[in-house]
Amino acid sequence: QVNIALLTVTDTRTINTDKSGAILVKKIKESNHNLIDRKIVKDEKDKIKKILLEWIKKDNLDIIITTGGTGLTGRDITPEAIKEITDKEIPGFGELFRELSYKTIGTSAMQSRACAVLANGKYIFALPGSSGGVTDAWDGILKYQLDINHKPCNFVELFPRLKEK
């Protein structure tokens, strides 16, 4: 079991209309993880960064998942907000995500800037705002990497060592 916070980045959705967030909430609970916080924020870098900085300081939080703001338009700035607080990038996540997306949406997959990083010993996964994108990311990557029993390795078993100096 891991403790997860979910941040939806959007200019148009509310908790009631956030389909991608609802999908992730369901998948988090089905996997027996704990959703300890959920927020919606506008596509504004300072507001996104403020919430992320607050969350990475929480001792009872392991993972932050964001949905939305990973495309190419002018308002899509989630990766930029995350980059400002990043300790280490996890490039394989975005690469694998785009490979999985390619199987579903073809070359349109290259328009996603989904990414993953470490910040203050916490994983941050930035997913697209589409329901298909969050489903691909969870079912194809996160479901396995957030399972302590997944072999040969997984993100969970690294928790104790993420803050090593």
Regions found by a protein language model. Name each.
Residues Q1-K165:
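Non-catalytic beta/alpha edge segments that cap or flank active sites
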